[in-house]
Every structure is written in C-alpha cells, then in structure tokens.
C-alpha cells in the first residue's frame, strides 16, 4: 500500500510540474517566434489561449494589439555552401 501511495504522489508531482511547460513554445526555438507584427500569419482563432496556440505548433504574443496573437513561426533554414 505504501508503494502505491508513493507512485501516486510521484504521478501527481509530474503532472503538476508539466502544466507549466505548456506555456513554452512546443518544439520551437525562440528565434522562430521573432516574427515582425506586419508579416504574421494567423494560426489561431478568436480567444485562443497561449497554451492552445503553442499546442498547435504556433507562436503566441499578445503584447501588440490589432495583429494576430497566435501566428505561424518562421521556418528555420539550413545554410548550404
């Protein structure tokens, strides 16, 4: 019984700890989300949350009014010589 309680506590801690991670960009580098406001391509819908937006693989920035807050990231390109 004690072992079961320990596993349950561990599971609760892991789930609670992972909820803060959702606010980070999922699989995106910070530079990919440095999209100028005038060229943002909408990736969300009205009232989309940052978590929902990031889970779609998009960037979220609500600091600039009247532009898409949930937008497609820049594509990283490889240098070819």
Swiss-Prot record:
Tissue distribution: Expressed in goblet cells of the intestines and colon (at protein level). Expressed abundantly in goblet cells of intestine and colon, and at low levels in stomach. No expression in brain, lung, spleen, kidney, uterus, pancreas, liver, heart or thymus.
Superkingdom as given in the UniProt entry: Eukaryota
GO BP terms: regulation of glucose metabolic process
UniProt KW Cell inner membrane keyword: no
Record key words, sorted: Cytoplasm, Disulfide bond, Extracellular matrix, Secreted, Signal
Disulfide cysteine pairs (residue numbers): 33-59, 43-58, 53-70
Gene null: resulting phenotype: Mice lacking this gene show impaired mucosal healing after injury and die from extensive colitis after oral administration of dextran sulfate.
InterPro entries recorded: P_trefoil_chordata, P_trefoil_CS, P_trefoil_dom, P_trefoil_dom_sf
Compartments reported by the entry: Secreted, Extracellular space, Extracellular matrix; Cytoplasm
One MF term in the entry's GO annotations: identical protein binding
SUPFAM superfamilies: Trefoil (SSF57492)
CDD domains tied to this protein: Trefoil (cd00111)
Keyword Signal appears in the UniProt entry: yes
GO-annotated cellular components: extracellular region; secretory granule
Signal peptide (UniProt feature, chain positions): 1-22
Stretches assigned to the P-type domain: 31-74
Complex and partners: Monomer. Homodimer; disulfide-linked.
Function: Involved in the maintenance and repair of the intestinal mucosa. Promotes the mobility of epithelial cells in healing processes (motogen).
Protein name stated in the entry: Trefoil factor 3
Organism per entry: Mus musculus (Mouse)
């Amino acid at each position: 019984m004690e072992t079961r309680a320990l596993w349950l506590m561990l599971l609760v801690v892991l789930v609670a700890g992972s909820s803060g991670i959702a606010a980070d960009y999922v699989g995106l580098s910070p530079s990919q989300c440095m999209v100028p406001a005038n060229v943002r391509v909408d990736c969300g819908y009205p009232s989309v949350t940052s978590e929902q937006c990031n889970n779609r693989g998009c960037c979220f920035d609500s600091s600039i009014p009247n532009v898409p807050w949930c937008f497609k990231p820049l594509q990283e390109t490889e240098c070819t010589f």
